[in-house]
Design a protein with these regions (language model features):
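Solvent-exposed, charged/polar functional surfaces in cytosolic regulatory/catalytic domains
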Residues: 25-28, 32, 99, 103-110
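Helix-adjacent hinge/juxtasegments
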Residues: 73-107
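Short, contiguous alpha-helical
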Residues: 2-5, 12-31, 35-81, 121-192
Length: 192
């Protein structure tokens, strides 16, 4: 996938393409990490790359539950959403995120009108009391916003772990040739 979204022909394709791009850059922050690095929280916050990916997978699924008006996870699940459980690995949360992305795209493909009302769940303190419904369009824009926000967090966490930044990670993941201005990321040599 390129570093920017290619031209698109319509709104639905644009929204899904921008969401896919943000998911991609979030997943890139995990490229080459070990499971222990993926759960490391090397900054002042408790955020980890693996935890951010899991949170976005759970959050995106929850928003699609809201769109479809089906029950969503509990607050306990939300609270644990930033942490990998004892049976979870980086590979398992990346797989979960891929499955959630495919579910989202299938759900959105099945909705005729992006203006379709999405009832605002009641009793959530950070949701507005004076808004009764969002639209599917609004939900997709919000997912793009949230994914971009957390991809930025993950960039900082990743750079703190081993100095890796977005474009060298992308170059390594996509096998770009080295140039005088861009060197693909390489795992640091392990001292023996």
């Amino acid at each position: 996938m390129a570093g920017i979204v290619p031209p698109v022909a319509d709104e639905r394709t644009a929204l899904l393409a921008f969401l896919a791009q943000q998911r991609y850059v979030l997943r890139l922050t995990a490229y080459g990490l070990t499971d222990s690095q993926a759960v490391a929280a090397p900054a002042a916050s408790e955020l980890s790359v693996g935890g951010l990916i899991k949170h976005m997978a759970c959050g995106e699924r929850s928003w699609m539950d809201t769109v479809l008006e089906r029950p969503s996870g509990s607050t306990d699940e939300y609270d644990r959403g930033f942490e990998l459980g004892p049976d979870e690995t980086l590979a398992s949360v990346l797989d979960l995120y891929e499955r959630v992305a495919a579910e989202t795209e299938a759900i959105v493909a099945g909705i005729d009108d992006l203006g379709q009302a999405v009832p605002v769940p009641q009793g959530v303190p950070w949701f507005p009391d004076d808004v009764k419904a969002w639209s599917v369009r609004w939900v997709l824009l919000h997912l793009i916003e949230e994914t971009a926000r957390h991809a930025g967090h993950a960039d900082i966490v990743r750079e703190t772990i081993d100095g890796a930044t977005a474009f060298p990670l992308m170059a390594a993941a996509e096998n770009w040739p080295a140039t005088e201005w861009m060197q693909p990321w390489q795992a640091p040599a392990v001292a023996r």
